[in-house]
């Protein structure tokens, strides 16, 4: 375990790169409906810090949780896995 403790990581796809040093990443997950036992796809969009502006739309990326960087940014870019 690192000195910062356990930080969550997630995988997603870049859906917007229009901001400076920030990309929007869409993360999909499957949840099971409690009554019908059917799996439903849910998604969330996170603003992610991209220091060098290397991400492009459609890139598959891995993001890691960090301290709050702004009002909406709480994730850092870990790696691009294209």
From Swiss-Prot:
Which BP terms does GO give this entry?
translation
**What job does the chain carry out?**
One of the primary rRNA binding proteins, it binds specifically to the 5'-end of 16S ribosomal RNA.
SUPFAM superfamilies assigned: Nucleic acid-binding proteins
Under NCBIfam families, the record lists: PRK05610.1, uS17_bact
**A GO CC term attached to the entry:** cytosolic small ribosomal subunit
Q: Which family does it belong to?
A: Belongs to the universal ribosomal protein uS17 family.
Instruction: Please report the organism this UniProt entry assigns to the protein.
Output: Pelobacter propionicus (strain DSM 2379 / NBRC 103807 / OttBd1)
Q: Show the GO MF annotations.
A: rRNA binding; structural constituent of ribosome
Subunit record text: Part of the 30S ribosomal subunit.
Q: What is this protein called?
A: Small ribosomal subunit protein uS17
Among InterPro entries, the record links this protein to: NA-bd_OB-fold (IPR012340), Ribosomal_uS17 (IPR000266), Ribosomal_uS17_bact/chlr (IPR019984), Ribosomal_uS17_CS (IPR019979)
User: What domain of life does the UniProt record list for this protein's source?
Assistant: Bacteria
Question: What keywords are assigned to this protein?
Answer: Ribonucleoprotein, Ribosomal protein, RNA-binding, rRNA-binding
């Amino acid at each position: 375990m690192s000195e910062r403790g356990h930080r969550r990581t997630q995988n997603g796809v870049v859906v917007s790169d229009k901001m400076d040093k920030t990309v929007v990443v869409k993360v999909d997950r499957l949840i099971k409906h409690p009554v019908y036992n059917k799996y439903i796809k849910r998604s969330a969009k996170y603003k992610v810090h991209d220091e060098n502006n290397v991400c492009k739309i459609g890139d598959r990326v891995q993001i890691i949780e960090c301290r709050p960087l702004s009002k909406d940014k709480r994730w850092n870019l870990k790696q691009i896995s294209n």
